[in-house]
From Swiss-Prot:
InterPro entries attached to this UniProt entry: PEP-util_enz_mobile_dom, Phosphohistidine_dom_sf, Pyr_Knase, Pyrv/PenolPyrv_kinase-like_dom, Pyrv_kinase-like_dom_sf, Pyrv_Knase-like_insert_dom_sf, Pyrv_Knase_brl, Pyrv_Knase_C
Binding residues annotated for K(+), in chain numbering: N34, S36, D66, T67
Gene designation per UniProt: pyk
Protein name in the entry: Pyruvate kinase
Pfam families with a match to the protein in the record: PEP-utilizers, PK, PK_C
Site (Transition state stabilizer): K219
Amino acid sequence: MRKTKIVCTIGPASESEEMIEKLINAGMNVARLNFSHGSHEEHKGRIDTIRKVAKRLDKIVAILLDTKGPEIRTHNMKDGIIELERGNEVIVSMNEVEGTPEKFSVTYENLINDVQVGSYILLDDGLIELQVKDIDHAKKEVKCDILNSGELKNKKGVNLPGVRVSLPGITEKDAEDIRFGIKENVDFIAASFVRRPSDVLEIREILEEQKANISVFPKIENQEGIDNIAEILEVSDGLMVARGDMGVEIPPEKVPMVQKDLIRQCNKLGKPVITATQMLDSMQRNPRATRAEASDVANAIYDGTDAVMLSGETAAGLYPEEAVKTMRNIAVSAEAAQDYKKLLSDRTKLVETSLVNAIGISVAHTALNLNVKAIVAATESGSTARTISKYRPHSDIIAVTPSEETARQCSIVWGVQPVVKKGRKSTDALLNNAVATAVETGRVTNGDLIIITAGVPTGETGTTNMMKIHLVGDEIANGQGIGRGSVVGTTLVAETVKDLEGKDLSDKVIVTNSIDETFVPYVEKALGLITEENGITSPSAIVGLEKGIPTVVGVEKAVKNISNNMLVTIDAAQGKIFEGYANVL
């Protein structure tokens, strides 16, 4: 199972039912809607399509609303475009004017108060660089030197690297978009241009007013956000490393180190993190990724990201399906190369000690040591699954939850496969329900060793405090085990020694009432022994112990109830017999 999650931006190239289906089948876990573009009507159409297709495919796909944010842009230019030439001067006005090579205006009136002589102003993703030469507060104009030439079109982005701006946390448009998202029951809000914890709290205030349970992922895109990351994470549910504007606001050579640090801080707190922007950028035009892009995606996974994101590749590119498949294949390959033992050791040192984390560590270590097939997390809020995920176990994590909302929010968490299953509230019912659901997914089958973890008493969120090692399978009989071995073989029911004569016993488990000295030559050739006679001093127990053969004695009605030629597993340590293959210790 692929563990790294894939976020796809839905746009003109991918909004059809046919393409949404292809993206889901290719590996999309979360659909991102960019509210910098499009109307509410257009986005509602996309939401309806995503949910319709996901329901038809019986897949869980979450929806992420990405706000436009309090960005700074230029106003319109004369004839839609102007040419700025290196060496010339240009005036940036706080009053709206039609842009010319001599003067243009910006949407942020306080820019004049935030910059100072020597500050840099970057236009159109940093393609044009200006340096402040003079500030005229009376005229509300900033005179700049043009450091490199370029064409400037309408409404292009403006960045102020190293400058602390006084923009609001969210705009009125953002607030309207968030209320729309609440109405449409989206799962995540990616908040653009977050600089301070108060920016996140403004969004939370809107969510609390509407009693909406939507996770907030701030996008860190500037130096101020980087500087305040610890405080921002305290009030956030996760994080997006938005490398596009970040690479303009800070020197590009610093972005990889900042990415690693942001991911590490999220890993420490067990909060999901998305790495975004230009991951497979060339696939907007080409059907194959570059080697550098493949390395970029893999390194983000090695850094510890929960999810990787596609932007223009799926929103407007020529090869949206191929981009998702490429992302999936890179993720699977990178995960296969991970040293999960070292990863667990590193995470154990990184994450702070607490009661909940102690259970998480125990589950992860036990899963590694016993090589369990899956970890089944029964969870109301998703907290149990996230607790396990932070330790990056090699085993699959199956999150069984009664809530569709929780299942969708688990779609962003590394290694977690969410499954919706209603169930009763008692602890026994919860555990049985979790095991049955895990089997239904096809991820585990009879004979697999799994770990079940949950919080008890049931129904309370954030109380992960229980771990149980469980063997999936049908126990057909039990008695007193002799020795600590286990064996898998085909039964041969022998009411008398004559039933054993002339038989190849090399793959057989002998089932009989009792044995005497005439049975011994046959028993020592067999894989295992099951008898009805009781006691550790019985002939069956003594022979089994002397010959080193896994044996279970005292099994009631063994000859009657255990069929001939049945594949069974003997677990002598527990005195149990399972039908079929069972991965016993």
